[in-house]
Amino acid sequence: MTEINGKRLLAELKELGKIGIGTDGRRTRLAASDAEKEGRDYVVSKMKEAGLKIVIDHIGNIFGIWDSEENKSIQPFMVGSHIDTVINAGQYDGCLGVLSGLEVIRTLKEQGIRTKRPIIVGAFTNEEGVRYAPDMMGSLVYAGGLSCKKALATVGTDGTILGDELKRIGYEGTIAPGFVTPSAFIELHVEQGPIMDAEGYNIGAVDNLQGIHWMKIHIDGVANHAGTTPTNMRIDAGLAAAKINVFCREMVEKSGGVATIGTISFKPNAVNVIPSKADFTVDIRNPKKEKLDNDEKYLLDYLKTLEETDHVKITTQPMTNFDPVPFDEDLCKKIEVAAKSRNLKVRRMVSGAGQDAQMMARICPTAMIFVPSVKGISHNPDEIGRA
């Protein structure tokens, strides 16, 4: 039975993981930053060492292609993920899916195994969406869900323009995104949750990726003295925000989804002043589209009620709306069979996080393979994956 060189893969994950660690000890490689350029350069160098042909498209997606005269006209099989990170990140998220694909090709070449199809390893631009929105941008553009022109014009949180930054770091490619449609796409990823580690599973065959709705909410109240304004005479934006947070938790406990108030700020943000303004984000997720849509409707209805009861003014702005994505059943079954043939404990999974695979599922049969996240930790320097 063919096996990859696990030590080599882990060593390369460690090397890539060193890139982007600042003086504060935090690992951060935001999309199209200098640190991410260094990470891109490392991955490209490893692809070239393995004898792969490098293609970079207009949105900066990197592809390492292994083909031959015999199979280059056949529709390729693609694997991949991303190498950009969140702030203060772990070293496995995304990177495992890129470097493991490269390791598979190296192993096949070293053992003299020829494949029916070309194999492509992809590293997609801006999966995390920290510096530029939306997340999963590179794969979304590749799959035709967002125009490349619009994506390249995206203004980042630091005022930079994505297209300018890709050009600056040397990754403004020459090939149109979507230059090839794969026969199938597989993304290997850490679970980013606690289930597999807690239940002792080695492999997750991911058959669904839950839908995601993000929105910004702005609340206008009235600033007033914290000590002299009676409770029943306050128009408190901070209190309204807190009520929305509690409502979201109670809502998803009924629907089986999850909801998160991930960012929040108050104005004037003073210890002795009732907040006149509150700005925050809401992240709602559910693997069932009907339940996801209903949760958003329930929240919007509640906001109207809150305006009346608390005398505040509330406005909303959609950020991201991705429907749940069912993955290819045949691929999921093959993942299960392969795991069992190696005596690995496998279970079906739903991905709670957005991934590049959900975008690639728009254009080809797609599935994901999960490995456990030890203690469920991810987006954290303590992130560890295991088999």
Spans of model-derived segments:
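Flexible, glycine/charged-enriched surface loops at secondary-structure junctions
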Residues: 57, 114-118, 173-178, 228, ...
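Zn-dependent metallopeptidase/amidohydrolase metal-coordination segment
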Residues: 6-22, 80-81, 345-386
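A short beta-alpha structural unit
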Residues: 29-31, 262-269, 281-288, 313-332, ...
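Glycine/charged-rich beta-loop-alpha catalytic/anionic-binding loops adjacent to active sites
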Residues: 75-88, 220-226, 342, 375-378
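Acidic, glycine-rich active-site loops and adjacent beta-strand->loop/helix elements
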Residues: 60-62, 83-85, 119-130, 192, ...
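A generic, well-ordered mixed alpha/beta core segment in the N-terminal half of proteins
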Residues: 85-158
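Midchain, well-structured core segments that form catalytic/ion-binding scaffolds
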Residues: 126-127, 131-290
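Acidic/His- and Gly-rich active-site-bordering loop/insert found
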Residues: 3-89, 108
